[in-house]
């Protein structure tokens, strides 16, 4: 049985059909990235998977007992509110100290445990959100534009950490990204979504798809060059 299986999913918001006839499977241990233009339904699909939105049609089948960790697109905290990373990790319910330490270590922010959240850099804050998602040792880790606002080095470091988490936990990773070079470097499969799934497959197969090229305004040479350039660098950039 697949870790996650979605079939014939339709979801409307405010009378507007946002997702139509979406089919998707996800296996344990793989990294899958969803790409698409703004308003294409990417975040809506993630919210339907975590149960925050209810589809009008179709089904979402999850492996029995599956645990999901979710890193949101953004989390706004009052900068004037004193809060350490350790305290944030204990909200909304307290966790044993050893669980918090393990999650912070997996996310690469052990040294920030006593830091004020307001003093963290953008990359450090995203890693803290990742640590919160890892507290439950998830079978499926979902990331919604988790590198938004980070520079190139920050993105590379963050996704290197995701690769390590995948290997340590054996979890599946489902992420949304607008960064095509991240998609080609970090993913086992890519899904192009624009209300419906336009194309899906390995990065190389998607890069050769007319639907993918049309979606991002790429010609054949640009799309394949994007794949080959970043795929050839992946073993260096994603290594410890």
UniProtKB/Swiss-Prot annotation:
What Gene Ontology terms describe where this protein resides (cellular component)?
A: plasma membrane
Annotated residues for binding of ATP: 36-43
Domain of life, source organism:
Bacteria
Report the EC number(s), separated by commas if there are several: 7.2.2.20
Please name the source species: Chromohalobacter salexigens (strain ATCC BAA-138 / DSM 3043 / CIP 106854 / NCIMB 13768 / 1H11)
According to its UniProt record, which protein family does this protein belong to? Answer: Belongs to the ABC transporter superfamily. Zinc importer (TC 3.A.1.15.5) family.
**Gene encoding this polypeptide?**
znuC
Membrane association type: Peripheral membrane protein
Alphabetically sorted, this entry's keywords are: ATP-binding, Cell inner membrane, Cell membrane, Ion transport, Membrane, Nucleotide-binding, Translocase, Transport, Zinc, Zinc transport
* GO molecular function (one): ATP binding
Task: List the protein's name.
Answer: Zinc import ATP-binding protein ZnuC
First-level EC class = translocase
> Which proteins does it associate with, and in what oligomeric form?
The complex is composed of two ATP-binding proteins (ZnuC), two transmembrane proteins (ZnuB) and a solute-binding protein (ZnuA).
Compartments, as annotated in UniProt: Cell inner membrane
Q: Where is the signal peptide?
A: none
């Amino acid at each position: 049985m697949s870790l996650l299986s979605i079939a014939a999913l339709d979801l409307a918001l405010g009378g507007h059909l946002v997702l139509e006839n979406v089919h998707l499977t996800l296996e344990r241990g793989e990294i899958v990235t969803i790409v698409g233009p703004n308003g294409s339904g990417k975040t809506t699909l993630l919210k339907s998977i975590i149960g925050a939105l209810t589809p009008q049609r179709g089904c979402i089948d999850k492996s029995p007992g599956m645990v999901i960790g979710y890193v949101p697109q953004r989390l706004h905290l009052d900068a004037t509110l004193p809060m350490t990373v350790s305290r944030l990790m204990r909200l909304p319910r307290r966790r044993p100290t050893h669980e918090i330490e393990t999650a912070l270590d997996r996310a690469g922010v052990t040294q920030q445990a006593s830091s004020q959240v307001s003093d963290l850099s953008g990359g450090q804050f995203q890693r803290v959100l990742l640590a919160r998602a890892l507290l439950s040792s998830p079978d499926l880790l979902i990331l919604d534009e988790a590198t938004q606002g980070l520079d190139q080095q920050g993105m590379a470091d963050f996704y290197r950490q995701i690769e390590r988490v995948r290997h340590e936990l054996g979890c599946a990773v489902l992420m949304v990204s607008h960064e095509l070079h991240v998609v080609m470097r970090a993913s086992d499969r890519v899904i192009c979504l624009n209300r419906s799934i336009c194309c899906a497959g390995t990065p190389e197969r998607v890069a050769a798809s007319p639907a993918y090229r049309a979606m991002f305004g790429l010609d054949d040479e640009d799309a394949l060059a994007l794949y080959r350039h970043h795929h050839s660098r992946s073993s260096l950039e994603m290594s410890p």
